[in-house]
Regions:
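C-terminal catalytic "cap/lid" subdomain
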Residues: 1-222
Length: 222
């Protein structure tokens, strides 16, 4: 629906499917893939509208590290939280995130910036469903560590590119960042793992960002 030239994958690894599922792809639930991986169950994801062959999800795939990026996903149900002017000392961040964990708030991308005069800023993302509770949960924590402010920004989306080939190929981040720059899309936050790069962009540019990344990695090519 977002990229008209998107094509079906014949196969994909458990790890890639897990990353896509947790990054906004609405194909599979993460827990289902985790269960299949745990018991080494190969399964097929098919369309409910036709009888065409689907995508096999399994441990090892034939392309493995030859193909750098296998998929692009956008999660539009994210909120950015900025906790500013907290004491820049050991334990401050731990107390903030311990409180959020105790309230079952799932934190994703995290950036800490040291500001001047002994204070720091924490920026992270949470699901929109949890955003309303963040300020309430952190109020007593901020009082304990000497103050701070909480600001919530909900007009964001998390764009992710996923592929096991990232393990052995350089330049993936540069390609993604250049594609977004060429489209005039600003990057807010950046997070990386072994097989995934995620960035936060403006919600209104999310679909455009998906198309730019899709084209940059030639995902419409067989």
């Amino acid at each position: 629906r977002v990229v008209r030239t998107a094509r079906k994958l014949d196969e994909i690894s458990y790890d890639e499917m897990l990353e896509l599922a947790s990054s906004g792809s609405k194909v599979m639930q993460s827990r289902s893939v985790e269960f299949a991986k745990k018991y080494a169950v190969t399964f097929e994801v098919r369309s409910s509208f036709n009888h065409n062959p689907g995508t096999l999800v399994k441990e090892e795939v034939s392309y493995m590290e030859k193909v750098v990026v296998r998929g692009v996903a956008a999660d539009k149900d994210q909120t950015k939280v900025i906790v500013s002017n907290i004491a820049d000392k050991p334990g401050s961040a731990a107390k903030v995130f311990r409180a959020l964990a105790g309230a079952n708030v799932n934190v994703d991308m995290i950036v800490q910036n040291a500001a001047s005069q002994g204070v720091a800023n924490l920026t992270f993302t949470v699901p929109q469903a949890d955003a309303g509770r963040v300020a309430r949960v952190l109020k007593p924590v901020l009082a304990e560590i000497g103050g701070g402010q909480v600001a919530v920004h909900d007009r964001i989306a998390k764009l992710s590119v996923v592929g096991v080939g990232m393990k052995t190929h350089s330049g993936v981040a540069a390609t993604l960042f250049q594609a977004l720059a060429d489209a005039g899309i600003n990057i807010d936050l950046i997070s990386t793992s072994e097989i995934k790069i995620s960035v936060v962009v403006d919600l209104d540019r999310a679909d455009e960002a998906v198309r730019a990344a899709h084209a940059a990695f030639a995902l419409d090519k067989a």
